């Protein structure tokens, strides 16, 4: 069947269903809201699947269930149907003689996709399937659009993303992915709560977008006649709270970055960001190991994570190496001496086919080499540490080597999952780094940071030694659900306008 023929068939079915809805309206029974369910299908299966048929013959278990009709098999005076609710499916057995006059005839006109309410008693069929023997049946919502059952579910990827509501109806693995996402967020929240962290909310609209190097979304506040930005990170507000005495804080919320779309990037994404006073980046690496090990056990029942044909072990201690060490390890033809000099490092990048801007210093050149030759190869759980100060404007300089900072990023499967560091609490150093960021912005770097005078004022009051970290929830869920694209773990990912 061609796309045009499918479209014509769908319009025909919609017209037929509209006629049925018109008749329901005429009878005054369209869209009732007085049916009450007392149990979910998943609860019934959990409690009664193991019971033998004799149990139901001896015990009349009466239930009231509701859900979307997903299958329908009419056999003369009796029929079977399956309804889907949030927890799963349950089978209904419907007999003409068990229903009020006319109810069975009405049922035969109903369509797959309609939402039903049913009351009756439980029994087991000859094949052992838990079933409701229905004695009261109502149509609660008439579905006008047919479900794509003829095509064995919804398989077109773009349609799945655009019409997630249909995707969720048709595909149980998709529903399970988003249940897992909820469990991941709940576990992270519980993990931090148990360790004395306070959950807070900070502004989503900010006069100065800070806390990360990224291009922001801009908007205008009409009442105040001022430009505002959707936040790219909550970092500077959370650290203001540390200054104010909330020594362990976290936030799980959205960030917005006006950048490209890819299988790993969405302009709107979810992060957990947390800060702990009197801790350093080593403490947070230890905490991250504990969090991810416990999380994989909770969600998967194992510390073995299977992703896109590869297996990652979250049980053993994670690998830790510096940016420089990783470059040398993955580029045997590059020497440490070459990485110590800007011009020689630029020559290395040129040899590797990596384009550079004239404004890049040695630290930025390192990162360009790292991102192009190392990052994608970091398959096993790995902490990369000692990021150059040039690319870490909010991180504390390392005491032994001020060229780098006390910063780490966590990688698995060749992608960054987390970023953390000992926080820069030296007011003068932070002010100087802000000034350098402003210079880069004036030179054309749209992702460079703004100068945030109020944040500096907060630092002048004194921020205790602190470490902070952000973990990308979306990428973490991708990993734990074996999802190849970030769009697979976002209920409503951003899409180009429909043609």
Swiss-Prot record:
CDD domains from the UniProt entry: LysRS_core, LysRS_N
Cellular component, GO annotation: cytosol
What is the organism field in this record? Thioalkalivibrio sulfidiphilus (strain HL-EbGR7)
The gene it comes from is lysS
The Gene Ontology biological process annotation of the record reads:
lysyl-tRNA aminoacylation
Subcellular location per the Swiss-Prot or TrEMBL entry: Cytoplasm
Q: Can you name this protein?
A: Lysine--tRNA ligase
The cofactor remark states:
Binds 3 Mg(2+) ions per subunit.
Catalysed conversion reaction? tRNA(Lys) + L-lysine + ATP = L-lysyl-tRNA(Lys) + AMP + diphosphate
């Amino acid at each position: 069947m061609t796309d045009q023929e499918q479209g014509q068939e769908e319009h025909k079915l919609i017209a037929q269903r509209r006629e049925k809805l018109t008749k329901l309206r005429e009878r005054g029974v369209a869209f009732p809201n007085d049916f009450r369910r007392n149990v979910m299908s998943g609860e019934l299966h959990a409690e009664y699947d193991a019971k033998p048929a004799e149990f139901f013959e001896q015990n009349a278990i009466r239930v009231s269930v509701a859900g979307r009709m997903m299958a329908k098999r009419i056999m003369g005076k009796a029929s079977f149907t399956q309804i889907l609710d949030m927890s799963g499916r349950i089978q209904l057995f419907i007999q003409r003689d068990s229903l009020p006059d006319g109810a069975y005839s009405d049922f035969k006109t109903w369509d797959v996709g309609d939402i039903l309410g049913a009351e009756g008693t439980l029994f087991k069929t000859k094949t052992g399937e838990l079933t409701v023997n229905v004695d009261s049946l109502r149509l609660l919502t008439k579905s006008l659009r047919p479900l794509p059952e003829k095509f064995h579910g919804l398989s077109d990827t773009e349609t799945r993303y655009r019409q997630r509501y249909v995707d969720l109806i048709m595909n149980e693995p998709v529903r399970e992915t988003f249940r897992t996402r909820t469990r991941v967020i709940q576990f992270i929240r519980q993990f931090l709560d148990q360790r004395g962290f306070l959950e807070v909310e900070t502004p989503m609209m900010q006069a100065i977008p800070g806390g990360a190097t990224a291009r922001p979304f801009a908007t205008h506040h009409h009442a105040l006649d001022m430009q505002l930005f959707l936040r790219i990170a909550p970092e500077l507000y959370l650290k203001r709270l540390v200054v104010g005495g909330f020594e362990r804080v976290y936030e799980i919320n959205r960030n917005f970055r006006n950048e490209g779309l890819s299988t790993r990037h969405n302009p709107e994404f979810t992060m957990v960001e947390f800060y702990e006073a009197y801790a350093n980046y080593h403490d947070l690496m230890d905490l991250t190991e504990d969090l991810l090990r416990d999380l994989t056990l909770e969600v998967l029942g194992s510390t073995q994570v299977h992703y896109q044909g590869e297996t990652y072990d979250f049980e053993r201690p994670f690998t830790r190496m510096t940016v420089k060490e990783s470059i040398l390890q993955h580029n045997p033809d590059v020497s440490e001496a070459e990485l110590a000099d800007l011009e020689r490092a630029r020559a290395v990048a040129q040899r590797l086919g990596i384009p550079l801007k004239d404004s890049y210093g040695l630290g930025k050149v390192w990162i360009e080499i790292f991102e192009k030759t190392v990052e994608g190869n970091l398959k096993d759980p790995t902490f990369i540490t000692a990021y150059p100060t040039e690319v870490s404007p909010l991180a504390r300089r390392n005491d032994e080597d001020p060229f780098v900072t006390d910063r780490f990023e966590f990688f698995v499967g060749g992608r960054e999952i987390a970023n953390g560091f000992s926080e820069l609490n030296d007011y003068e150093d932070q002010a100087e780094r802000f000034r350098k960021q402003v210079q880069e912005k004036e030179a054309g770097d749209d992702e460079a940071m703004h100068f945030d005078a109020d944040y500096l004022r907060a630092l002048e009051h004194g921020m205790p030694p602190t470490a902070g970290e952000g973990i990308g929830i979306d990428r973490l869920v991708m990993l734990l659900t074996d999802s190849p694209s970030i769009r697979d773990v976002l209920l409503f990912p951003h899409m180009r306008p429909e043609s």
